[in-house]
Amino acid sequence: MPGLRCAVGLPNVGDYGDPHLLVDLACRAERSGWHGLFIWDHLAYEPGWAVADPYVTVAAIATRTSRVRIGVLISALARRRPWKFAREMATLDALSEGRLVVGIGLGSQPQAEFAAFGEDPDPGTRHQLIDEGLDIVCGLWSGQPFSYEGSRYRVEDSLFLPTPVQQPRPPIWIGGRWPARRSFRRAARFDGMFPIFEGVGDAEMPTPEQLAAAVEYTLSHRTDRAAPFDVVLEGQSTGQDPRLVSPYQEAGLTWWIEKLGWFRGSVDATRRRIEEGPPVP
C-alpha cells in the first residue's frame, strides 16, 4: 500500500513497565518490517503497576535500533519544563541519528498525573502551557539566541546548541480528542495529527468518514495544504489485512499504529503479533 507506514504502539505501564522488555520488542519490530515503535507517556497508572520512564526507554531503544522511527505518543508537555524538554529531544534526535518523532498532547488522568503532584489539572491551563511550551521548544531548536515572554513562561536570550539533526525540526505530531477542535487547530501548525475519537471504545475503530472529517477540519486550518502532513491512527489488526487499513488511507491516513498491550493478551501474544509484521506489505 504505497505511502502508508506502520508502527507498533506499546504501553509503558504494568507488564510493559519494564524497559528491557520494551527495548526487546522494539528490536523485534525493526527485524519484522515495521516502520516505527512508539510508547505511551504515563507518570502513574493503576495502583501497584510498574511504570517505565518513556524517554529514558526511547533513548535505550535508539541505541539498539537503526531504522525505525521512534518516540512517545503522546507526551503531556504541560507537566514538563519546555526548555528541558527541548534539550532532551535534541539529544534524542542526535542519539537516534534523526529518527525521532515528537508527540504532544493534553495528557490524560488529570488527577493521578497532574493534581496529585501539585500541577494544575484544568484543561484550559494545560492547553495554554502546551501552546507556550511549543513556542519555546521550537524557538530553542532554532540555533539562534531566543527570548520569550508569555503568561506562563519566560526565556531570556538563550542559545541552545546543537540543533536537532532533523531540520527545521523533528516532526511534531499533535494528539487530541475529536470532535474537540482546539487540539486540531494546534495540529494544523505542525507536522501531523493523532486523533482519538470520543465514543469509540478501546477495541473499536472510528469509521473512515469520522477520520476524514477530522482530517478535513485540520487541513482547512493549515496555511499550506500541500505541505507534508501526517495523519496517524491506532487500531488492531491480525496480521496482513490491507482491506482493514485501505479505507482509512483513502481518508488521509499516513501512519497506522498497531495498538498492543495487556488488553490484547499476554506479552507472548504481543511478541507474536509484532513478529507477524505490519498489516500491509
PLM region spans:
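Active-site-adjacent structural elements that line small-molecule/cofactor binding pockets in enzymes
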Residues: 1-281
